[in-house]
A protein has these predicted regions:
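Internal intein/HINT superfamily modules and their associated LAGLIDADG
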Residues: 1-306
């Protein structure tokens, strides 16, 4: 391929081909240049993709997307959906403050969940993108939905969700999300960065594990009624783990799935199955119905800082 430093040797020809209606990948093939390189330099010159020439698209059905539809979705967190998706983006979203881009990418088996987020944003007709990754374990495909909105990025920032948040985020205050909606936020976060497992070796005990910053998880534990619960290190990094097991995990999961209308289906199905197995134990059933509920029902879960 032509070295990138020799861009002057091919860029004029690329512009000519572009103006003839040729899409990026065809230009790349004809000039023996990487497609991403062609795309980068043409976009730098102000040229957009020749969408009408992309295969399998009906030209008559093409139209510009009205991204303003999504501008106000996180202005106020006042519904279950908003609280849930804010939690999911906290855990597994990508927010580019410099380019005003919001993106969500999940593995192929969770494609329908990416479509749910797209629908929530009011952009059903916007195409999902696929990303293929090859490792020693084989090839995997992710589905990604992204859109650009300066207003949405600003609102997410006000809610504590921003770029490079992995080591910085704090649990949102009740000024951002009300007590009535906080479990929907937690469910979104768990769907994005939590796991529900069983004890193994014949054990029916459920374990709920969530990753996050120490500051975030300290408040997360407090809201759930485990203020003094120990946090564990994760792979020798500053990221921490909150681990809740046994009947207490069932109690928490029951709370976050109560009256829920949106969730990651595979994780919800796993919760139902492991709950069924755990409650086959009379002791677990008694604890859940009695002492645990009483112990956690009236804990002080006030959150004052974001």
């Amino acid at each position: 391929m032509v070295p990138i430093k020799d861009v002057t040797q091919w860029i004029e020809q690329a512009v000519i081909l572009y103006k003839q209606g040729m899409p990026y990948y065809k230009i790349a093939q004809q000039l023996n240049i990487g497609r991403k390189t062609v795309s980068h330099y043409l976009r730098e010159l102000g040229f957009k993709s020749n969408e009408k020439y992309v295969r399998n698209i009906n030209v008559n059905k093409l139209r510009k997307f009205d991204y303003s539809i999504a501008d106000n979705i996180f202005e106020n967190i006042d519904t279950e959906e908003k609280a849930y998706w804010l939690g999911f983006l906290y855990a597994d979203g990508y927010i580019d403050n410099s380019k005003n881009v919001i993106s969500l990418s999940l593995k192929e088996s969770d494609k329908s969940h990416v479509e749910k987020f797209r629908h929530f944003c009011g952009l059903d007709e916007k195409k999902l993108h696929t990303k293929t990754k090859t490792t020693n374990n084989g090839t995997s495909v992710n589905y990604e939905f992204s859109f650009s909105s300066k207003k949405t990025v600003e609102d997410l920032f006000k809610c504590g969700c921003f770029n490079k948040k992995t080591f910085k985020i704090s649990f949102p205050s009740y000024d951002i999300i009300s007590k009535e909606l906080i479990y929907h936020f937690i469910r979104g976060y768990i769907d994005g960065d939590g796991s529900i497992t069983h004890g193994g070796c014949g054990s029916s005990a459920i374990t709920l594990e969530v990753l996050g910053t120490e500051k975030f998880l300290t408040t997360y534990n407090k809201v759930l009624g485990f203020e003094n619960k120990k946090l564990y290190s994760f792979n020798h990094t500053s990221i921490k783990r909150s681990i809740i097991s046994g009947p207490y995990a069932i109690y928490v999961l029951d709370k976050i799935y109560n009256n829920a209308h949106i969730f990651l289906q595979r994780k919800y199905d796993k919760y139902l199955e492991l709950r069924r197995l755990a409650l086959a134990s009379p002791r677990t059933a008694r604890l859940l119905a009695g002492k645990i509920g009483k112990d956690l029902a009236n804990v002080d879960t006030e959150v004052t800082t974001a």
